[in-house]
Amino acid sequence: MIHSKKLTLGICLVLLIILIGGCVIMTKTNGRNAQIKENFNKTLSVYPTKNLDDFYDKEGFRDQEFDKRDKGTWIIYSEMVIEPKGKNMESRGMVLYINRNTRTTKGNFIVTEITEDSKGYSRSKEKKYPVKMENNRIIPTKPIPDDKLKKEIENFKFFVQYGNFKDFKDYKNGDISYNPNVPSYSAKYQLNNDDYNVQQLRKRYHIPTKQAPELKLKGSGNLKGSSVGSKDLEFTFVENQEENIYFSDSVEFTPSEDDKS
């Protein structure tokens, strides 16, 4: 009887230890997930910045990577990628380097087409059109004979100018992951077509699917903040071997480099 009681007590003790350990792990995971979501929320707080000139006076996260005299450079990038079934993949997007030291902005409108040859090898053809930004206007810096393309470049709007994540804290059922070895972290949320940002993308781009996208937020670097690393977001409408439709965007604050172009 005594042996039986000791055995029962031992089993209960082991179960209690497992239960406590599980609670500790769950608490740590929930705390880290909340930290990841808050980290992304800070990044998304710059959306929307309708006037790109406002970035000249907008301060970002600074660490030891920055020279004390360097005010930093904002790098903004937006790209739409469409690969219909049986057709080539094409991406059209723009990147700008907004230098807060010189208060000048330059970048490129980039068109990339990926084809597949008879042997199944992928071939990438990229064309860059240099631009500058003045008074919130995109201006090509070299002649563009194609009027339609010129108009597309001049009328280009970055997602940061119209995207809005004021309700991000209310996003539910996210799939949040963390890899401490890189370190990297991500969050995924299934959206619907009534979502404001989805409606804005459909308004500006011909998106050949009615399927609602998944929002993917990806980051790397120290969760507490670092200028080394990156954060970007992606609206994935379709992703498979035959068809790909997605929109990607990033806004980063980095130490300035004079040779950016």
Swiss-Prot record:
Gene3D superfamilies: 2.50.20.40
Lipid-conjugated positions (N-palmitoyl cysteine): C23
Lipid attachment, kind S-diacylglycerol cysteine: C23
Transmembrane annotation, as ranges: none
Keyword Cell membrane: yes
Topology within the bilayer: Lipid-anchor
One Pfam family it belongs to: DUF576
Subcellular location: Cell membrane
Sorted UniProt keywords: Cell membrane, Lipoprotein, Membrane, Palmitate, Signal
Major localization listed first in the record, in broad terms: membrane
Family to which the UniProt record says this protein belongs: Belongs to the staphylococcal tandem lipoprotein family.
Name of the protein: Uncharacterized lipoprotein SAUSA300_2428/SAUSA300_2429
